[in-house]
Amino acid sequence: SEQAGFRILVGNDMMAAAGKTFEATHPNAKFLLGEIQKFDAKDFLEAAGLKPGELHCLIGGPPCQGFSVYNHNRGLDDDRSQLFHEYMRIVEGIKPAWVVLENVTGILSAGGGAAADAIVESFENLGYRVEKKILKAEEFGVPQERRRVIFMGNRVGAPIVWPDPTHGPAGGRLPPFVTIKDAIGDLPLLENGEDLGAQPYKTPPLSEFQLRMRGNAQYVTNHAAPRLGAINVERLAHIPPGGSWRDI
């Protein structure tokens, strides 16, 4: 978000580990640790030093188990989907100019489309005009295939403009998709269960992505291979190049 020009003010999560990561990457922001049900909009406003209506954008991603394509009893009445209503409670109290909500693609078919319609209606009831769209992470330089539904809207009458893809298939007009090799091809090979600790990079960056991810770092850290049992090692040996567990 900061790379896109935003100044991050406050974050929230119920997991302390997530809070430590947030504080490390956003040292000038405040973090509220705990379940969202324990907080009111005024808690976030006080932490941000703002009044209702002054925040430019509120971003949320309520846990999406209730909307999963694997959940056959899904909809906004699912207990795990109630966190969406908590998110809307905070939106109502903070009154941000813009709102962004992220969820799995299964939300579009949950309840025959009723869940997605209910989300849009909930925003509209608070004065927001909202649109939804599936965005593909690989089209924006992320080295993995990931689809997410983004609900984006505002209450200030501004046009809703979706970003154009920055990456595409090789040979097209856009830079090619970032591959796994582009992302981690400079990391040393490890044996099963091996952890070499911190060590200097053995090669210069081999791709633009690696150059950007390294920054000023001179050492490889947190690079370890989990120890797998013999049966899992055997399974991995039978996955062909470019394949997955489905090919075993």
Residue ranges and their predicted role:
Residues 1-4:
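Conserved SAM-binding loop of SAM-dependent methyltransferases across substrates and taxa
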Residues 8-9:
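Short beta-strand element of Class I
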Residues 20-50:
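S-adenosyl-L-methionine
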Residues 34, 60, 101:
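Redox-cofactor binding/interface segments in oxidoreductases and associated redox assembly factors
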Residues 43-54, 69-248:
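Class I S-adenosyl-L-methionine
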Residues 63-67:
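Conserved radical SAM core fold
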